[in-house]
Amino acid sequence: MSIFHINVCDLKKSIPDIRVGDEVYLSGTVYTARDAAHKKIRELIENGGVLPFGLDGACIYYSGPTPEKPGQPIGSCGPTTSSRMDVHTPLLMDNGLIAMIGKGPRSPEVIDSIKKHCGIYFCAIGGAGALCARSVKKYEVIAFPELGCESVKKLEIEDFPVICGIDCRGNSIFQKGCI
């Protein structure tokens, strides 16, 4: 297994080199979105609305960070269960999304969409929100502030630790004997 240090803006060209189980340290911009935000983003796409961020080449982190503590840029920001977003993911990938960060397995439809769009799914460490927060350098709420911790946030991250859970060929860390 390999180790990669990748800026999100260069992720698209790096995806074919990454395999299931590879360690990746991401830097750059990611956006948080959970269930409620995904529903709103879906409605915007379906109704021709303006999205709060461009999906082309974007990476969404399935997380609802807590407010920052004194002297820290953000509170805890661990991953949430990704399967809750599966109903929305193919549509978002059809509109340019290439990467997702979360925890747990994905549906066959999401795996097919990852293969179709040469995308990738990363797994972050569940239960380690404080560890994940160490890689966040700054954040801002950019959409749906009424959703509180589930609002869409723009995070600037540095060496955010993830593992490739599903690669662009559709191989999944959740398949028996995959790694």
What are these regions (language model features)?
Residues 1-10:
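Short, structured beta-strand/loop micro-motifs enriched in basic residues and often containing a Trp
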Residues 11-12, 23, 29-33, 168:
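Short, charged beta-turn/beta-strand-edge "cap" motif at the junction between a beta-strand
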Residues 12-17, 52:
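Short, surface-exposed secondary-structure edge patches
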Residues 11-14, 147-151, 171:
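A short acidic, often aromatic-flanked loop/helix-cap motif at beta-alpha or helix-coil junctions
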Residues 88-89, 163-179:
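Active-site/ligand-binding-proximal alpha/beta "capping" segment
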Residues 32-33, 37-160:
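Feature captures the catalytic cores and cofactor-binding loops of soluble hydro-lyases/lyases
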